[in-house]
From Swiss-Prot:
This is ERO1-like protein beta. FAD binds at residues 186, 188, 199, 251, 254, 286, 299. Changing residue 393 to A: Some decrease in P4HB-binding. Efficient homodimerization with wild-type protein. Loss of catalytic activity when DTT or P4HB are used as an electron donor. Disulfide bonds join 81-390, 90-95, 90-130, 100-262, 207-240, 393-396. Keywords: Disulfide bond, Electron transport, Endoplasmic reticulum, FAD, Flavoprotein, Glycoprotein, Membrane, Oxidoreductase, Redox-active center, Signal, Transport. Its EC number is 1.8.4.-. Pfam families: ERO1 (PF04137). Highly expressed in the digestive tract, including the duodenum and lower digestive tract. In the stomach, highly expressed in enzyme-producing chief cells (at protein level). In the pancreas, expressed in islets of Langerhans and, at lower levels, in enzyme-secreting cells (at protein level). Detected at low level in many other tissues. It is a peripheral membrane protein. Belongs to the EROs family. It comes from Homo sapiens. GO terms for molecular function: FAD binding; oxidoreductase activity; protein-disulfide reductase activity; thiol oxidase activity; unfolded protein binding.
Length: 467
């Protein structure tokens, strides 16, 4: 080989390496450049949310989610899909529920609270038996006797009003308590036609959108030639604020769920022990502006918008919990008091945020039209909560139902300001009530958003280090 050829080959190698570095640097800079600045339809900037979440909210909300009151969620994962015959499953075999056998469930939960506090938590053998069920998409229903017995008492603190969600009947034999800490939201392998059908139904039929308008990157939509989605956003910008907000909430929820899957991805499995962690390739596939034709940054901005909406709801509902009559009751007086103190501390932080979304800008037209639009808004969202029963993966269904109910509870709060202001200090109110399930869903859903924003910061660092 001649010297000239060798020099040419070496030069090409250097050029390729330089091009790779430039590409990675460009990717990082584009992601950061496009997911920044002031959000549409509000006066808040992304950097302020990042700092507020990192230093004030995330550490406290994570701690709150570990408390008994907030870690147990009752859900019916056996409700049939009301819209189509669902036959989709996770691509991983363990993406279904494997609850503990009936014989392993402590008798206290079935016999009421007659033997309350008399038994210790599940012994080691029971825990080992149930841990076999906690794999990938499987739901682990392991609970302590004391926790299960306390749930019956919690029920008497609950009441309800009109909802933005289709709530599960907690009295149904199919409803079961799930320990959320034993069932973290993460990648299960659930994907393909079944998953796309769920999101397609949500976007195409429940976002105030005519069938002639298609959202970008929809694999179930007909080919649109050179249309890169601009026609969709032209249509979206022409909508009233309320309908734009609705779409952004759904898109933000979708983005948050996708971030959780990217951040807790099955990296490898050795001798039956899975290893979970962030997957940069999956993150780029879902959010890189080049790979998503500009959609990724829009989705992430909608995540921040959703965070603002739920943050605002927490600040507005604080007076409900500040009353002495409201207890976060589990039966452990000392822990209950500590949990309420922590929750009130979080509420104080939410009220201190200076750039809240102004919900009064919504449904502010003539009373008749505003009332009709608000009801349409509520029914559309309620229908979306029903679609969550069509998710083929039980773990995905669990977290989908919880986060949908959490957002529905946030909307209920934002549109009940007058009722909250009139709450009596020392007696229950018929004007506004939250069930325990709504409270658990609200705080855990916001915790998921807080985690998503934290995960996004981590991915930015990983992209920077990969240059």
């Amino acid at each position: 080989m001649s010297q000239g050829v060798r020099r040419a080959g070496a030069g090409q190698g250097v050029a390729a390496a330089v091009q790779l570095l430039v590409t990675l640097s460009f990717l990082r800079s584009v992601v950061e450049a496009q997911v920044t600045g002031v959000l549409d339809d509000c006066l808040c900037d992304i950097d302020s949310i990042d700092n507020f979440n990192t230093y004030k909210i995330f550490p406290k909300i994570k701690k709150l989610q570990e408390r008994d009151y907030f870690r147990y969620y009752k859900v019916n994962l056996k409700r049939p899909c009301p819209f189509w015959a669902e036959d989709g499953h996770c691509s991983i075999k363990d993406c279904h529920v494997e609850p503990c056998p009936e014989s392993k469930i402590p008798v206290g939960i079935k016999a009421g609270h007659s033997n309350k506090y008399l038994k210790m938590a599940n012994n080691t053998k029971e825990l080992e038996d149930c841990e076999q069920a906690n794999k990938l998409g499987a739901i682990n229903s392991t609970l302590s006797n004391q926790s299960k017995e306390a749930f019956i008492d919690w029920a008497r603190y609950d009441d309800s009003r009109d909802h933005f969600c289709e709530l599960d009947d907690e009295r149904s034999p199919a409803a079961q308590y799930v320990d959320l800490l034993l069932n973290p939201e993460r990648y299960t392998g659930y994907k393909g036609t079944s998953a796309w059908r769920v999101w397609n139904s949500i976007y195409e039929e429940n976002c105030f959108k005519p069938r002639s308008v298609y959202r970008p990157l929809n694999p179930l939509a007909p080919s649109r030639g050179e249309d890169d989605g601009e026609s969709f956003y032209t249509w979206l910008e022409g909508l009233c604020l309320e309908k734009r907000v609705f779409y952004k909430l759904i898109s933000g929820l979708h983005a948050s769920i996708n971030l959780h899957l990217c951040a807790n991805y099955l990296l490898e499995e050795t001798w039956g022990k899975p290893s979970w962690g962030p997957n940069i390739k999956e993150f780029k596939h879902r959010f890189d502006p080049v790979e998503t034709k500009g959609e990724g940054p829009r989705r992430l901005k909608n995540l921040y918008f959703l965070y603002l909406i739920e943050l605002r709801a927490l600040s507005k509902v604080a007076p409900y919990f500040e009353r002495s009559i409201v207890d976060l009751y589990t039966g452990n007086a000392e822990e209950d008091a500590d949990t309420k103190t922590l929750l009130l501390n979080i509420f104080q932080d939410t009220k201190s945020f200076p750039m809240h979304f102004d919900e009064k800008s919504m449904f502010a037209g003539d009373k008749k039209g505003a009332k009709s639009l608000k009801e349409e808004f509520r029914l559309h969202f309620k229908n979306i909560s029903r679609i969550m029963d069509c998710v083929g993966c039980d773990k995905c269904r669990l977290w989908g139902k919880l986060q949908t109910q959490g957002l529905g509870t946030a909307l209920k709060i934002l549109f009940s300001e007058k009722e909250i202001q009139k709450l009596p200090e020392n007696s229950p109110s018929k004007g506004f009530q939250l069930t325990r399930q709504e409270i658990v869903a609200l705080l855990n859903a916001f915790g998921r958003l807080s985690t998503s924003i934290r995960d996004l910061q981590n991915f930015k660092v990983l992209l920077q280090h990969s240059r």
